[in-house]
């Protein structure tokens, strides 16, 4: 098996999206608007509090209540539409990918497939391709949405003071880029090992079924079952380790978010005490940061979940890139 870097696998998989680029742009636009609506519902709450305390606000109180209601409804509609577009893209591409894999298998038959583990092939065609749904539905558009959302929110918060904008940028980059990269490095090749073991187990089960009569004839049923249980336990152990990594990733992400929220509150309070910003420069940037980690959290979770996906993509690309043992010659007498 050829081992490719995560970026190589990602670039190859993104290249398949080209025929559905319009739907991807639509999903990104709707997702961005939806996340902005969700964040500004909380920001409108901060402006309403300022209005009640007698501070000047950019929007009157009645308009704030109307905007909160409208934004809540729009958020729901756009969230649904974004997910519909993403999953339409994902399942269309999975069908396209399966078609390409079957074409590759026909090209490789029979010489290259004769000695290949049939159970492993079934695992690639079914579960490995199915795992790519995570990449197409929950990775490409969320990454672009997070980048655009970060720019907009950093500019919005930075309008109160440049230091607050830089702090917000550091928060988004840490949660959305640094944490998933570190988690991915710590996971190592766990995802590839898990998918390889899953394929080997599928092959073992298939061989056991096909050789059932011989197993019964030679009284090897108990030994075969013990080996199957041992392989299953090893696979479950690897999966448990990956889930522990995902759990630690979530815990670290939530802790970092709380620390940056506290840092925003303390920094804005210090600037207010120094006369650099008013009370609105404390309240609005703080609640804006509180409510705006959604896109970054979606990326933080990918540090552990994408390990399986990239491993599955690597196994699928192995089949697509495989060269036939014998070149097919047609149309020559």
Where are these regions (language model features)?
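Membrane-integrated ABC transporters
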Residues: 1-38, 57-64, 82-86, 90, ...
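Juxtamembrane helix-loop junctions of ABC transporter transmembrane domains
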Residues: 6, 29, 38-46, 50, ...
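Transmembrane helix-loop-helix hairpins at lipid-water interfaces of multipass membrane proteins
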Residues: 18-78, 158-163, 276-279
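Transmembrane helices of ABC transporter permease
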Residues: 19, 23-34, 138-193, 266-278
């Amino acid at each position: 098996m050829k081992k490719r870097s995560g970026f190589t696998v990602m670039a190859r998989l993104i290249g398949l999206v080209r025929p559905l680029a319009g739907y991807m742009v639509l999903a990104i636009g709707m997702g961005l608007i939806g996340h902005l609506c969700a964040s500004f519902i909380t920001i409108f709450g901060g402006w309403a509090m300022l209005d009640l305390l007698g501070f000047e606000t950019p929007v009157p109180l009645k308009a704030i209540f109307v905007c909160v209601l409208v934004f809540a409804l729009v958020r729901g509609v756009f969230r649904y539409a974004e997910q519909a577009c993403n999953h339409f893209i994902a399942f269309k591409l999975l069908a396209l990918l399966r078609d390409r894999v079957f074409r590759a298998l026909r090209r490789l038959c029979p010489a290259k497939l004769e000695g290949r583990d049939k159970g492993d092939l079934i695992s690639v065609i079914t579960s490995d391709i199915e795992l790519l749904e995570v990449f197409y539905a929950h990775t490409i558009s969320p990454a672009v949405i997070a980048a655009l959302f970060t720019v907009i929110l950093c500019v919005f918060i930075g309008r109160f003071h440049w230091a607050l904008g830089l702090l917000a940028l550091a928060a988004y980059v840490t949660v959305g880029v640094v944490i998933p990269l570190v988690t991915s490095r710590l996971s190592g090749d766990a995802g590839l090992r898990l998918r390889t073991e899953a394929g080997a187990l599928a092959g073992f089960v298939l061989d056991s079924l096909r050789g059932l009569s011989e197993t019964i004839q030679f009284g090897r049923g108990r030994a075969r079952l013990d080996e199957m249980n041992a392989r299953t336990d090893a696979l479950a152990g690897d999966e448990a380790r990956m889930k522990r990594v995902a759990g630690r990733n979530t815990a670290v992400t939530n802790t970092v978010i709380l620390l940056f929220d506290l840092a925003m509150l303390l920094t804005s309070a210090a600037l207010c005490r120094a006369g650099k910003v008013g009370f609105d420069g404390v309240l609005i940037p703080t609640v804006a940061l509180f409510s705006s980690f959604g896109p970054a959290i979606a990326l933080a979770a990918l540090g552990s979940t994408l390990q399986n996906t990239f491993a599955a993509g690597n196994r699928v690309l192995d089949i697509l890139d495989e060269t036939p043992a014998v070149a097919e010659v047609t149309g020559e007498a």
